[in-house]
């Protein structure tokens, strides 16, 4: 009988400790004063040629608030009209998702990673063009935060099946033609 009482007390103590140690990490704030922090305010990609993808750049989105923050949506402001491709915490902002993701949760003290690359469209100009868009984070509190995405793009003329000839007046010639 004493063993049963001892086991019962041990079970009660263990259960009590487990219940008391539970942390409420599932609470989310709707306060407009709780906002996200970003590793950069502008994500600049390398200068690129039109129709040639840039290397992927990344940024971090931090939640330094005392509670979790839920983003109602994360989207490209232009709806991907400029050629940016974005992945937010593993979700690609593609055509099937309407170039946005919804209900992104960032727990208190946690962060998510955003991956960005660009394949700019042909601009039909001789000068470099600034390609820009904004990544919009709409928080559950109604606060909207933006991160600017930009890169310069040059139109290039790609010469295929051409060789540079040495000592010939014609600089470019067709191979075997």
Predicted regions and their residues:
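Hydrophobic beta-strand positions in extracellular immunoglobulin-like domains
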Residues: 60-61, 118, 137
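Surface-exposed binding patches on compact interaction domains or structured appendages
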Residues: 23-44, 54, 64-122
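Bacterial N-terminal signal peptides that target proteins for export
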Residues: 1-11
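Intrinsic-disorder/low-complexity, polar/charged segments enriched in Ser/Thr/Lys/Arg/Asp/Glu/Gln
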Residues: 54-58, 111-113, 144-148
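Terminal connector regions
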Residues: 23, 122-155
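Hydrophobic beta-strand core residues of beta-sandwich domains
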Residues: 49, 104-107, 174-177
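Low-complexity, Pro/Ser/Thr- and charge-rich linker/hinge segments at domain boundaries
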Residues: 147-175
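C-terminal motif of bacterial Sec signal peptides marking the signal peptidase cleavage site
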Residues: 18-21
């Amino acid at each position: 009988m004493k063993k049963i009482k001892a086991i019962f007390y041990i079970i009660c103590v263990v259960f009590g400790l487990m219940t008391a140690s539970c942390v409420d990490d599932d609470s989310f704030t709707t306060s407009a004063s709780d906002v996200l922090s970003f590793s950069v305010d502008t994500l600049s990609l390398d200068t690129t040629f039109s129709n040639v993808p840039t290397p992927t750049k990344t940024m971090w989105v931090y939640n330094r608030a005392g509670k979790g923050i839920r983003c109602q949506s994360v989207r490209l402001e232009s709806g991907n009209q400029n050629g940016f491709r974005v992945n937010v915490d593993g979700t690609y902002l593609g055509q099937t998702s309407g170039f946005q993701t919804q209900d992104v949760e960032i727990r208190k003290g946690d962060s998510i990673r955003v991956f960005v690359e660009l394949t700019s469209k042909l601009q039909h100009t001789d000068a470099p063009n600034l390609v820009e868009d904004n990544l919009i984070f709409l928080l559950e509190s109604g606060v909207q935060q933006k991160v600017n995405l930009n890169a310069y793009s040059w139109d290039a003329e790609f010469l295929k099946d051409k060789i540079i000839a040495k000592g010939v007046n014609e600089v470019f010639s067709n191979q075997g033609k």
